[in-house]
Amino acid sequence: MSFTVVESRWPDVWLAATARGITICGDFLAATALALALQGAGAGGLAVSGLLLAATLPLVVLAPLAGRLADRVDSRTLLVTVGLAQAAICALLALADHPVLVVGLVALLACGLAVTQPCLAALLPAMVRSRDLPRASAISQTAVSLGALGGPVLAGLLVGQFGTRVPLLLDAATYLALVVAGLLLRTRRGGRRTTAVVTPADPRGTATAWRLRRDPLMLVMVVSTAVVIAAIGGINVIEVFFIRETLNGSPTTYGLVSAAWMAGMLPGGWLAARLANRLGDDAALIRGVLVTLAACSLMVLLAAMVPGAGLLVPLWLVAGAANGGENVFANLLTARRVPEAMRARAYASYGAAVQGGSMAGFLVGGALLTAVPPRPLIAGAGVAGILVVLIFVPVVARAVRRPSPGDPGVRQPRPADADAGLATPDGPAEPKPEAGDTVGSWLSASHVPGSGTSSS
């Protein structure tokens, strides 16, 4: 059974964003503490690499299953159950000493994130009407960015005073914010009943017929973003060597540069939200995604030319703003085109592509760094990102012209149960309102496009 609420539920938006920001802060706090714990225990680079892989791989491998689960199970049940499980896992992490046990617990934690991230991302469009989604996305991204900025700072204070156990216990407490949000949110989706502000999608198909591979614009967005991230993602491995060794920057400078990208995402998300309201069609949104990806790549290319580390700060601020804009455009495009009943799967697929691209960038950047100096590697990453965008420009042009299932004049397959549930033969897989559209690994401080997207 489904019913429609005409007005957007802003208290739900703020509650979900606050819970997400708190957990992100705890995650970045724990990431710093765990890295220090492994280093202090004498673990080498292999253990740290295993930690990063454990935090990322489940988000990629479990995406199809996790997205389906988030679409079919009541969101309140998922947030409360998984939030409690993640809090317990973080508490065990505070007591774990052996690197293998730490890596295993991190992998379990990431399994929970594979479910909660698409669950929260799919809830956001259900909380507001379509015209309010850009603003809601900006609010959510602001909370995530503030959490990601505050976590490492808090870690620097707590680890020096109390060691690693207190930060990990604090991270466990932050997951209780998900539990509270799950209990208090009026908006619910999944399960047998949906209580939502139903956003009219342009899904190019019914809930049973929609597939990512059949939606050319969505497919282009996912693939182009993943490939650009793979191209420039290696800077997260190279950056510390470039700043500290090539540019002779201080640890303080390195910290400022690292924070600049995330800081730039704050105004970038809000600027994109204002612009998104003027973009009346999906083609304009996918072009916005390409423009922002190109801007990120250009800033990376320019970074290879700077004579001093301090000049990286303004470049990273601009790149972060473009990254924030890309997140808003991608969230809005997904909410517009994907039926409500399948949005968690779509967000999970997008998140898996982002994480897969990040993993590829880490591996390639780390491998090349053993043989090539940092400066030419950063320049190569920027050039590669720009080339990828240029390659996808004609692909987008063809995708815009190509009819999608659900476009006028394209016959829809009528499922046997077309008159039941959300799917209808003549419209989106959700009822229309009576009146009157965010995803990244918790352990990675990555600041390439897609990071800090909540699926956000």
Regions found by a protein language model. Give the residues of each.
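Short, intrinsically disordered terminal tails adjacent to the first/last structured region
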Residues: M1-F3, P408-S456
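Alpha-helical transmembrane-bundle signature of multi-pass membrane transport and export proteins
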Residues: M1-P415, G427, S455
